[in-house]
């Protein structure tokens, strides 16, 4: 068993989304003009904010699109009340995190909880949201079949591929550990 302890001044919690427009087979990504990087929207949790709310807010602030969490049929270690099988898919889908990533930069641990969301690629993008002004982002709806190749970071590619598989019904209902 690996253990680590991080006190409040040595970690930050962030949340992000893989946002799908299922009807049009598209995924919402961010293009950072100054570096040429493509990545998933994410950002820091505010004090007292729920993780799910952080994911939705940060996606809106960085992209200008209104989204909502999307229940998907995913295998999870989270338990259902009254169900001892912790390696099963949730009937009807779940909005639990699809992944968690961790990285340490300058001694600070960043933990990112990833959620699946739905959005409308034909919706009118809200302009002048907080992050757009400061970060020089473009929001791009990329075809599902092309997005993994477009994304810059390995973790974003892996998470997005898994979400697309789940959205297409290709994730097994259970697995063996």
Regions found by a protein language model. Name each.
Residues 1-22:
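Acidic, metal-coordinating catalytic segment for phosphate/diphosphate chemistry
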């Amino acid at each position: 068993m690996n253990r680590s302890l991080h006190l409040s001044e040595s970690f930050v919690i962030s949340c992000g989304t893989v946002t799908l427009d299922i009807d049009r087979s598209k995924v919402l990504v961010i293009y950072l003009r100054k570096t040429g990087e493509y990545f998933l929207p994410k950002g820091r949790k505010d004090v007292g904010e729920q993780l799910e709310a952080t994911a939705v807010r940060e996606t809106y602030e960085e992209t200008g699109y209104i989204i909502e969490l999307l229940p998907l049929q995913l295998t999870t270690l989270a338990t259902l009340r009254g169900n001892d099988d912790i390696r099963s898919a949730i009937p009807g889908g779940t909005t639990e995190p699809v992944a968690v990533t961790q990285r340490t930069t300058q001694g600070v641990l960043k933990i990112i909880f990833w959620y699946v969301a739905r959005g409308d690629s034909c919706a009118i993008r809200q302009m002048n949201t907080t992050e757009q002004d400061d970060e020089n982002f473009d929001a791009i709806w990329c075809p599902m079949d092309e997005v993994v190749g477009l994304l810059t970071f390995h973790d974003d590619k892996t998470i997005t591929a898994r979400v697309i598989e789940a959205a297409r019904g290709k994730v097994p209902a259970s697995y063996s550990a």
